[in-house]
C-alpha cells in the first residue's frame, strides 16, 4: 500500500521542528535538579600555625589548703600481713620444774656392775720418810688393776663413790695423811694415835667421790712409828661403792 506523499512531508516537518526545539532548549539555562546525597567527611587538615602568646592572667586567690586540719578518727584495722621469714633462735630459757618421779625400773644385772677393789699389806720394816707415800708393797687383792704396788697409789678409772680404810700397826706415835688429787694431791684427813714404847693398831676410813684419774694414797708425817712385821701387819684397802652414772 502506498503512502501519500503529503503525509511524508508532514512527518519531515514535524521532525525538523522537534530538532530545532531541542536545540533551543539546550541553549537556555536549565532548572536545578534535586540535591544529591551528602558525601563522606574529608580527612583532617594539617595543623595550623601557632597562635600568638596571650596576655598575662589575673592573680589567683590565696589558698588555705596547707594548714593542718583537726585530727581525724582512727581508721579501721588493716588486713593481716603475710607471714614473715623465720627469725633467729632465741636464747636458752630457764630450766623448768622437776618432772614427776618415774616408775621403778627393772632389776639390774649384778654381773654388769663394775668390780673395783684392792687390798695391800706392808712387808717393809724400815723408817718411812716424811712427805712420801707409805709403801704397801704386797698386793692381796687388785680387781681391775686400779692399785699400783710400786707407787702404793690407787688411781680412779671409773668415776664414782669409793670407800677407803687402813689398819696400821706401830710402836710409838703415828700420824698419817690421806691424800687425793691428780698432779698436786691435797690432804683430805689426818689420822693420829699417841703411845710410847708399845704396839698399837691405828685405823681410819673415809668415803670419797672421785673423778677419773684422781689418785688416793697414805702419806707419812713426822710422827711415823709404822712397822710391817709378822704378827703386826699394816693394810691399806679400798673399793667402789657406786659408779657415777652422770659422768
From Swiss-Prot:
Location of 5-hydroxylysine modifications: 53, 56, 71, 86, 92, 104
Record keyword S-adenosyl-L-methionine present: no
Low complexity compositional bias, start-end: 40-52
GO MF term list: identical protein binding
Residue ranges of domain C1q in the record: 111-247
Sites of Pyrrolidone carboxylic acid modification: 23
Signal peptide stretch: 1-22
Record key words, sorted: Calcium, Collagen, Complement pathway, Disulfide bond, Glycoprotein, Hydroxylation, Immunity, Innate immunity, Metal-binding, Pyrrolidone carboxylic acid, Repeat, Secreted, Signal
Region (Disordered): 30-78
Residues recorded as bearing 4-hydroxyproline in the entry: 29, 32, 35, 47, 50, 59, 77, 80, 95, 98
Physiological role: Core component of the complement C1 complex, a multiprotein complex that initiates the classical pathway of the complement system, a cascade of proteins that leads to phagocytosis and breakdown of pathogens and signaling that strengthens the adaptive immune system.
Subunit structure as annotated in this protein's UniProt entry: Core component of the complement C1 complex, a calcium-dependent complex composed of 1 molecule of the C1Q subcomplex, 2 molecules of C1R and 2 molecules of C1S. The C1Q subcomplex is composed 18 subunits: 3 chains of C1QA, C1QB, and C1QC trimerize to form 6 collagen-like triple helices connected to six globular ligand-recognition modules (C1q domain).
Protein name as catalogued: Complement C1q subcomponent subunit B
Organism: Bos taurus
